[in-house]
Amino acid sequence: MTLTNTSDAVAIAEPILEQLEQAWNAGDGMGFAGPFAEDADFVEIRGGHHHGAVAVGRGHEAIFSTIYAGSTVELQLEKARTVGPGVVVALVHSTMTAPSGPMQGVNRARMTMVIVEEDERWAITQFHNTLVSA
């Protein structure tokens, strides 16, 4: 698939964000990892690095059963654009609400995702999550 404009990039990014949001809100770590490439890199808000979709899923399973149990997230696409054939970069705003734990309350973050076309699907290959200070 050859992308030619921003609307194409948005059409690629939005379903991925929907899948991430639905999985998070269901507390489904492996579902959250679903749109990630097998060899994806994920940098989380504290700077930790997870390599591979399986690691992303396991990491999220762990936080959904502990510090983020019962949390919800809302993802909003700020911008998506193509940067080359089969490559989309998406900037995303995240609002996560945690009922308890060290992140209790409303937390905002910004994410940068590199989404690539591989094996006839679009997958996140790079993901960087940065906590936004109040």
Language model features by range: what are they?
Residues 108-134:
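Short beta-strand edge/turn micro-motifs at domain boundaries
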